[in-house]
Amino acid sequence: MEVDVPGVDGRDGLRERRGLSEGGRQNLDVRPQSGANGLPKHSYWLDLWLFIFFDVVVFLFVYFLP
């Protein structure tokens, strides 16, 4: 699509140029979504460490059963 060719109302070229530049700026300002407390919604490292912790706790509990 050629940007220099005016559209029906003559403003499409300017609108397209402005839209492209705004789109570039919006892509740079994207931030990861976070929950209400500021932590990421999906903290996979936290899930991993909690799994390891509970795995060790269950292992020790079963190991030391009389």
Swiss-Prot record:
The modification N-acetylmethionine is found at M1. Residues 1-38 are annotated as: Disordered. Keywords: Acetylation, Endoplasmic reticulum, Membrane, Transmembrane, Transmembrane helix. It comes from the Eukaryota. One of its GO terms (cellular component) is endoplasmic reticulum membrane. The chain crosses the membrane at residues 45-65. The keyword RNA-binding does not apply. Residues 9-20 have a biased composition (Basic and acidic residues). Inhibits the activity of the calcium ATPases ATP2A2/SERCA2 and ATP2A3/SERCA3 by decreasing their apparent affinity for Ca(2+). Homooligomer. Can also form heterooligomers with other sarcoplasmic/endoplasmic reticulum calcium ATPase (SERCA) regulators ERLN, PLN, SLN and STRIT1/DWORF. Monomer. Interacts as a monomer with ATP2A2/SERCA2; the interaction results in inhibition of ATP2A2 Ca(2+) affinity. This is Sarcoplasmic/endoplasmic reticulum calcium ATPase regulator ARLN. It comes from Pongo abelii (Sumatran orangutan). The gene is ARLN.
